[in-house]
Amino acid sequence: MSHFHRTAAFHTLGCKLNFAETSTIARQLTDAGYDKVSFDDRADIYVINTCSVTENADRECKLHVKRAMKANPEGLVVIVGCYAQLKPEEISQIAGVDLVLGAKEKFNILSYLDDLEKSESEGVVHSCEIEETDFFIGSYSIGDRTRAFLKVQDGCDYKCTYCTIPLARGISRSDTIENVLKNAREIAERDIKEIVLTGVNIGDYGKGEFGNKRHEHTFLDLISELNQVEGIERIRISSIEPNLLKDESIELVSKSKSFVPHFHIPLQSGSDELLKKMKRRYLTKLYNDRVHKIRDVMPDAAIGVDVIVGFPGETEELFMETYNFLNELPISYLHVFTYSERENTEAVGMQGVVPIPERKKRNKMLRILSEKKKMAFYQTQLGKTLPVLWEHENKDGKMYGFTENYVRVQKDFEQASVNQIEFLNLEKILSDGTVSVQSSYESFLAKA
């Protein structure tokens, strides 16, 4: 096969960690002589990296298999990722799927390609028990974005009652600080301006760094070392558990030239009763304390929140506890997830199932609240001159970028601005929810 199959296409579903891992798999194939092409182009190999968090994992997987088959009916389709680990046999039955690789095998894709042929029936499965996945494979994305996702940690030892991620990714384990720094320097040398630190539970960094369960280092050790790396304009922390976000880490970010003032902190519920049912490792008092600590030392920081609606036992009263808690918190935006039942999780057997229409109603209420929070936060940034990193896409003659504190801005497309950081004055909020900008010099003249 190696003489005939020379093009490969990739599609990623889900989180930033998946993007980092897809990029690593893509580099393995390109290093072996494959040319990378668009997913809608005719390719010899299609790799789909799946997610298990969204309730539509099965439908999305089938949709992208069909896309691949439409582009090239003779192309080989390989499925990897969290959904592939959880449901390998089901995926192998999808028409068009030729190979399913579990968590342990996804980075060994090349070893399977030479003998792989287009399946007339079901795909070949190479999976494993998740307990066998106890090693760390470093990954980072590069080449297709103005920012790189750098994987520093994988797996999770928490037992949240709604979550399948430990079943899909295994125990908590970390890259070594030396390797993280090496990867960060490689990214910086490629003129990528922003690195996003990713993992399943990055606040748990250091566990399993050298193949054991002890913490050799901490998350604070990691970010302290990264803070010294030359050539990285921005480092963003993707998401960190509130109980693992320590004062020292917040203080370091507040004084750093590289780490940006942006935190994404999962909450999941503003009800202590539900947090206990979810087996989260904090209550609302600690969460409230973390948010206000950030605000005290970084008044302009963006603070994002994950929240789940419709968890079993979430009465109207308990939902309103969440709503009111979030409404009072000085946060910047929400990511709202509607609870969906997952096999092999504790929550599946819980009493107090919330009807689907009620889940959707609560989701809508929190999405409206999120928009209000975001607009209020953006309003506080108008009139300020902030650094903007411009992205590469040209959307109807416009280009978009983000400030350090995650305000999304736009201007007329200029090729020279792509992947550049420009200091610009934030003018006004536009109808699409982005912010218009003008150069700080133009702003100075307008006020003169």
In which residue ranges do the predicted regions lie?
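Proteins enriched for Cys/Gly/acidic motifs involved in redox and nucleic-acid/cofactor modification
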Residues: 1-205, 218, 248, 263, ...
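A structural micro-motif
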Residues: 34, 75, 98, 232-233, ...
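Residue-level signal for inorganic ion chemistry
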Residues: 47, 82, 109, 197, ...
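Short, solvent-exposed loop/turn segments at secondary-structure boundaries
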Residues: 57-59, 171-178, 206-213, 277-280, ...
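Conserved SAM/AdoMet-binding glycine-rich loop
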Residues: 77-78, 86-87, 91, 189-316
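Glycine-centered loop/turn positions within well-structured domains
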Residues: 107, 158, 203, 243, ...
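Contiguous mid-protein beta-loop-alpha structural module that forms a pocket-lining wall or clamp
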Residues: 314, 330-331
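Terminal RNA-binding accessory module
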Residues: 349-448
